[in-house]
């Protein structure tokens, strides 16, 4: 198929990936037609018509370079990511993590793109894969049915999917502050989380209520398949008590403060279990329950989650919900630049490609956007080094075993190993990987 001669590039979908792709293309002097159906047609999960809306957590996760997602964010900053820049401008306290005021952040991304002289925003649903120009499809896991059918046809009609869930959000003014305490795990960063401590007796009662609570039904023909990184809390609870105690209710590093007078097990300095609440907006009036994505019926959420100390009278401004995420057979369908193997004028980006997470989705949009622009200019494709996070992630999702392919977060395990003797200390090893990654990225960019 010959390269398109159109004078613009289409970007379909203005989520994190599409917003990033549109910006990267326009930054390179190429007109963009950015299509977004929200505002004309709603999705089950989105609450606004803003671009890059965060529908699950408000966290971009760890910010340290000894964390793979922290490395990926730093690489994206060096590539002038619109998502990272606006995220930084709308940060809220989150200890060692990067969390944002979700509304302020999405509004600022929307304003920047809508006011860009080379970006034409078109509100409307796309039901066919365009063939008029180079196109980046970034319609996300909530792709409309009509377009999803066309994309699934590329899979031979056998699309993949998993279920994703969001955690409840609570009005802070309804939290009993006498029963919670402010602290970040291991006192890392500023004290940013409200911690709801549980004794063993409280935890066991909570676990029993959670595992017996009624879930909202799935369609009869759909199996329950969850992404491990966003598993409903009730599913996790049914795997066993230790799954929660080593997961979202892990008490390690969250010792009681000296002035704590609430119930505790004997003289233990650390609770048996802890539920953490994280600030969800800049005003600090909303908090989400960390790791408590759920598919329980709303009445059951209220009943069970009000068993958490401090939340006995909590008001839920949003209950947890679950939705089906579709993703592609990327190892068979896409190249390392997220370009279609069968149609070189077509790129895909975001969670539909099998990357998992806000930052990873935006990163895929950045890679796809840059390479769509380079194709437009008839320049050689830019494949980032596998020693970098932004190079290793697209390499993984396009080279994984197709038969067992599942969505993947960025992690040090997919980045090319260091040469020479293995560094035993994990922190030092990750620091060395990050140092090499940033040096290699700078070298790559300097060669362009």
From Swiss-Prot:
Transmembrane segments: none
Gene Ontology molecular functions: flavin adenine dinucleotide binding; tRNA (uracil(54)-C5)-methyltransferase activity, 5,10-methylenetetrahydrofolate-dependent
Needed cofactors: FAD
Residues reported to bind FAD: 13-18
A biological-process GO annotation: tRNA methylation
Enzyme Commission code: 2.1.1.74
Keywords (A to Z) from UniProt: Cytoplasm, FAD, Flavoprotein, Methyltransferase, NAD, NADP, Transferase, tRNA processing
The organism's place on the tree of life at top rank: Bacteria
Keyword Zinc-finger listed: no
EC class (word): transferase
Catalytic activity: uridine(54) in tRNA + (6R)-5,10-methylene-5,6,7,8-tetrahydrofolate + NADH + H(+) = 5-methyluridine(54) in tRNA + (6S)-5,6,7,8-tetrahydrofolate + NAD(+); uridine(54) in tRNA + (6R)-5,10-methylene-5,6,7,8-tetrahydrofolate + NADPH + H(+) = 5-methyluridine(54) in tRNA + (6S)-5,6,7,8-tetrahydrofolate + NADP(+)
Places the protein is found: Cytoplasm
GO cellular component, one term: cytosol
Function: Catalyzes the folate-dependent formation of 5-methyl-uridine at position 54 (M-5-U54) in all tRNAs.
Family the UniProt entry places it in: Belongs to the MnmG family. TrmFO subfamily.
Name this polypeptide is given: Methylenetetrahydrofolate--tRNA-(uracil-5-)-methyltransferase TrmFO
Highest classification ranks of the organism: Bacteria, Bacillati, Bacillota, Bacilli, Lactobacillales
């Amino acid at each position: 198929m010959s390269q398109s001669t159109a004078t613009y590039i289409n970007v379909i979908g203005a989520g994190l990936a599409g917003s990033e792709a549109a910006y990267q293309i326009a930054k390179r002097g190429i007109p963009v037609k950015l299509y977004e159906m929200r505002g004309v047609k709603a999705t089950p999960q989105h609450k606004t018509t803003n671009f890059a809306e965060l529908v699950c957590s408000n966290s971009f996760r760890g910010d340290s370079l000894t964390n793979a997602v922290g490395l990926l964010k730093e690489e994206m900053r060096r590539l002038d990511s619109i998502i990272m820049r606006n995220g930084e401008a709308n940060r809220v306290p989150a200890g060692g993590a990067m969390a944002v005021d979700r509304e302020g952040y999405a509004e600022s991304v929307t304003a920047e793109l809508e006011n860009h002289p080379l970006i034409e925003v078109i509100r409307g649903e796309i039901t066919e894969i365009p063939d008029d120009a180079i196109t980046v499809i970034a319609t996300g896991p909530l792709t409309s049915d009509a377009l999803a059918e066309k994309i699934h046809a590329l899979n031979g009609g056998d699309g993949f999917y998993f279920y994703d869930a969001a955690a409840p959000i609570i009005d802070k003014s309804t939290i009993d502050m006498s029963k919670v305490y402010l602290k970040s795990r291991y006192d890392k960063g500023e004290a940013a989380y409200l911690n709801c401590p549980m004794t063993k007796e409280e935890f066991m009662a909570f676990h029993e209520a959670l595992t017996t609570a009624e879930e909202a039904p799935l369609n009869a023909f759909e199996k329950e398949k969850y992404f491990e990184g966003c598993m409903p809390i009730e599913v996790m609870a049914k795997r066993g008590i230790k799954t929660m105690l080593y997961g979202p209710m892990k008490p390690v590093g969250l010792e009681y403060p000296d002035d704590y007078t609430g119930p505790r097990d004997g003289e233990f300095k650390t609770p048996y279990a802890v539920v953490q609440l994280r600030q969800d907006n800049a005003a600090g009036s909303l908090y989400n329950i960390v790791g408590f994505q759920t598919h329980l019926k709303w009445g059951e959420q209220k009943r069970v989650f009000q068993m958490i100390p401090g939340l006995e009278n909590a008001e839920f401004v949003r209950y947890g919900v679950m939705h089906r995420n579709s993703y592609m057979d990327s190892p068979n369908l896409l190249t390392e630049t997220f370009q279609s193997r069968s149609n070189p004028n077509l790129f895909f980006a975001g969670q539909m490609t099998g990357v998992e997470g806000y930052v990873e989705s935006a990163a895929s949009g950045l890679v796809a956007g840059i390479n769509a622009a380079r194709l437009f200019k008839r320049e050689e494709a830019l494949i980032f080094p596998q020693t970098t996070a932004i190079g290793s992630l697209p390499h993984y999702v396009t080279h994984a075993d197709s038969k067992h392919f599942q969505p993947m977060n960025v992690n040090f395990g997919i980045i090319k190993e260091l040469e020479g003797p293995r560094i035993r200390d994990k922190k030092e090893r990750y620091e060395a990987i990050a140092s090499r990654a940033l040096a290699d990225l700078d070298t790559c960019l300097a060669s362009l």
